[in-house]
Structures are given as structure tokens and as C-alpha cells.
Regions:
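C-terminal ends and interior cores of transmembrane alpha-helices
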Residues: 2-14
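Cytoplasmic helix-loop-helix junction between adjacent transmembrane helices
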Residues: 22-60
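Intracellular juxtamembrane helix-capping segments at the cytosolic ends
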Residues: 32-45, 162-176
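A membrane-interface helix-boundary motif in multi-pass transporters
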Residues: 77-90, 204-222
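C-terminal membrane-cytosol helix-exit motif in multi-pass small-molecule transporters
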Residues: 89-108, 225-233
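Juxtamembrane intracellular "pre-TM" segments in multi-pass secondary transporters
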Residues: 103-132
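Helix-loop boundary and gating motifs at the non-cytosolic
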Residues: 126-127, 131, 136-147
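C-terminal transmembrane helical hairpin of 12-TM major facilitator-type secondary transporters
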Residues: 150-167
Length: 240
């Protein structure tokens, strides 16, 4: 509800600072909701099917992001930013309704410290996390170009969806039995960080040729990083 209130606030905000504050609130709430969703997806599946549950959740999340971007751009061009905001809030309310229909048996936490990061970062997956960040940087850098009529970023996002699912399997196989949710969250965070860094760099450069140059360099670095570092590391460290 806090995230939806922040999204609704976009329609009435009147300053850049206020916009950033709302975005920070939305991002924090989205991160918590994503982590909770991953945990629920694992808890409601049997032990033998939890890896498959991870994959289904990953596909749903990536496809939702891709469809959301396309619909958002279309609605913005036809009806303006305020209508996009209202559509986002409606989608959020629908997600709350569907989440409320899921029954999860209560399990009291055991030995939980006051502050820990075990639900967010998987140390064993730091190498593929960096690789995922480099890959996501490419569509992130190309996304702002859609506002000048260049839609190659949609193709890059589609490629990112398929690559991320394969990477998700890698993250899960690097995790131990009780760390599948953490593996999923780490993959999400590294991908989202790459998109954010890419968009930030593109907005800073403000030049189409330079943006394509930087995106091309990042794509080549991602390929070499995977071949030389990520894949050998994965083959050495995988546990299943």
C-alpha cells in the first residue's frame, strides 16, 4: 500500500526532489515485495519442485516487466503520464488481491538476528551477479532512446528476459538447499542495478551515438566476462 501511495504521488508531485523521494520509497517497497514474493513462491511448492517454482516466478517477473514497459510507453503517448500512474496503481491493487488469495502456513522464524542480509545477497554468486549487471546495463542504456523514437531497447529487453532465466538457473545451482530464495533475489537485484546504472549513464551522456558506443562496449565486456570468468566459476562452484 505504501508503494502504491508513492506511485500515485507521481501524478501530483511538483518538484524533482519530491519525485526522487517518491521513487526511493517505491524502490524500497518494491525490493521488499519482490523478496517476499520469492519467499512465498518457494514456501508454497514442494521441496522437489522448488527450483521449478523459482523458474516460474522468474519468468513471470521478467515478462511482467517487459509488458509493463510496452504498455507504459503506449499509454504515455496516448493518454499522458497521469494515466500511466493510474494504470500502475490499478495493477498494484490487482496484485494485492491475488496475493491475498495465496495461503501460506505460518512458520515461526528460528534464530533470526536483528539485521542480516541473507535474504538479499548470495556471496557465492558474486561473479554471475557482476555479469548480470553488465548484461542488464545494455537495455538500461538503450531505454531512454525510446523517447526519441528508437525502439531497439525493446529487443534488448526481450533478450534480457531469456538470458535472465538462464542466469537464474545458474544462481540457484550455486546456492545451497536453504538459499534458493536468496539466489533469486540476488539475480533480481543485480539485473535491476544494471538497468538503473544503464539509464543513469544514458541520461548523463545525452548523445545517441555515445550511448550506442557505451552499450556495445558493455555487451562485449559481458560476453568476455561470461566466457572467461562466470562460466568457469559456475562449473567449479555449483552444488547441484
Amino acid at each position: 500500500l505504501i508503494m502504491l501511495a508513492a506511485v500515485l504521488g507521481y501524478a501530483f508531485v511538483d518538484g524533482y526532489t519530491k519525485f526522487l523521494l517518491l521513487a526511493a520509497v517505491q524502490g524500497a517497497c518494491f525490493g521488499l515485495a519482490t523478496t517476499a514474493g520469492i519467499t512465498v513462491a518457494i514456501d508454497i511448492t514442494t521441496s522437489a519442485r522448488r527450483s521449478a517454482g523459482n523458474m516460474v516466478y522468474a519468468w513471470a517477473a521478467r515478462l511482467g516487466m517487459l509488458v509493463g514497459v510496452v504498455l507504459g510507453i503506449g499509454m504515455y503517448r496516448m493518454y499522458g503520464f497521469r494515466m500511466v500512474t493510474y494504470l500502475s496503481v490499478a495493477a498494484g491493487l490487482a496484485s494485492i488481491f491475488f496475493a491475498s488469495r495465496v495461503y501460506v502456513a505460518f512458520r515461526a522464524p528460528i534464530g533470526v538476528s536483528l539485521c542480516n542480509m541473507d535474504r538479499f545477497l548470495l556471496p557465492r554468486a558474486w561473479v554471475p551477479a557482476i555479469n548480470m549487471l553488465l548484461i542488464a546495463f545494455v537495455p538500461g542504456a538503450l531505454l531512454p532512446l525510446m523517447f526519441v523514437g528508437d525502439y531497439w531497447s525493446l529487443a534488448a529487453l526481450a533478450v534480457l528476459v531469456f538470458i535472465t532465466v538462464s542466469f537464474m538457473k545458474m544462481f540457484v545451482k550455486l546456492s545451497h538447499h536453504c538459499q534458493r530464495g536468496t539466489a533469486n533475489t540476488t539475480c533480481h537485484l543485480s539485473m535491476e542495478a544494471g538497468l538503473l546504472v544503464g539509464m543513469t549513464v544514458a541520461c548523463h551522456l545525452m548523445d545517441k551515438a555515445q550511448i550506442y558506443h557505451v552499450a556495445s562496449v558493455a555487451a562485449m565486456l559481458a560476453v568476455f566476462f561470461f566466457v572467461l570468468l562466470t562460466y568457469p566459476y559456475y562449473k567449479k562452484k555449483q552444488v547441484r
